[in-house]
Amino acid sequence: MAADLKSPRRIATEEAFSIPEVAAGLRGVARAPGNSLDLILVKRIYDAPKDDHPQMAALLPGLLDLEEKRLPDMDKNGVAMQLLSLTAPGVQMFDADTATELATLANDRLAEVISRHPTRFAGLAAFAPQSPKRAVKEMERAIKTLKLNGFIVNSHTNNDYFDNPKFFPILEAAEALDGCI
């Protein structure tokens, strides 16, 4: 049963998803040496022993499901639409090449599910800030070709934030594309 659209529509605006390739990559990140505070979250979501963190172990299947259980759950809870974005930490913990590839793949999958359910889902595109030039190209593709609604960046990228001038081309592209970040 679809949400009652005669009443005010309930739109969930911070709905995370992932794809198997990102999950596998983050599992690898979780198992690599490092001291980033982000590793705590990554380990709990992507590499937690089920016995140690049963709630976190149950989280990943929900992130990977974009239709089978998500749509009935939306109906059950009266949610007419979800604004989907790649879950934290996005592609920020990968090298530039891997991040670019995974962001492109995630955006393609997101656009596919939106095309199947355009009244139920909208989406924010991921991009790889590690390579601002390639990020701008993916941002343009996401808005112009995939018809996504804006962009998601999950926190910092290699301990750099968007006030660093190297990221200004990304901010300029978002403005030119009239896309929110």
Regions flagged by a language model, labelled:
Residues 1-181:
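Helix-coil boundary/capping segments in enzymes
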